[in-house]
């Protein structure tokens, strides 16, 4: 799946939860630690245990890119007031198709573990989350998704 196909199937929309402060609307860039999920390997990776705060990255799919940042945002200057990045920091509060969390696999550098865990840009359906997997796989990554929680009708946040 290409980014263009993804955007056509799952059009961008404003964040479900609007930025609460100017800091949450501040668009972060490459100097702040933002990178684009284009092809493996990820430069200067930080590894963590999937499903935990350690090594958790935030990602979004926008109309023209797939930016990501380490949630702790250690390179951001001046530091964020909350101490952590929000998905809206990847968009400046603008529209995005969807977003979530990811962890890099410590043993297999081309494997990503993802969730659709975003309060601001959650995937709207199981198909949208499945299409995120297809998009990332088309870029050369192996992808393990936490999937969709049928009980809550939302992206699962726990890996099984």
Model-found features: residue ranges?
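Eukaryotic phosphoinositide-binding membrane-targeting regions
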Residues: 1-160
């Amino acid at each position: 799946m290409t980014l263009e196909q993804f955007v056509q199937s799952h059009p961008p929309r404003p964040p479900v939860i609007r930025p609460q402060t100017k800091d949450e609307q501040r668009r972060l860039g490459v100097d702040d630690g933002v990178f684009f999920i284009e092809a493996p390997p990820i430069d200067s990776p930080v590894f963590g245990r999937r499903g935990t705060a350690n090594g958790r990255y935030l990602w979004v799919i926008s109309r023209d890119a797939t930016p990501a940042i380490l949630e702790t945002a250690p390179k951001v200057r001046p530091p964020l007031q909350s101490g952590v990045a929000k998905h809206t920091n990847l968009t400046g509060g603008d529209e995005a198709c969807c977003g979530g969390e990811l962890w890099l696999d410590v043993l297999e550098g081309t494997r990503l573990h993802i969730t659709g865990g975003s309060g601001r840009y959650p995937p709207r359906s199981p198909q949208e989350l499945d299409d995120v997997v297809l998009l990332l796989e088309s870029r050369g990554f192996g992808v393990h998704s936490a999937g969709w929680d049928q009980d809550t009708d939302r992206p699962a946040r726990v890996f099984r």
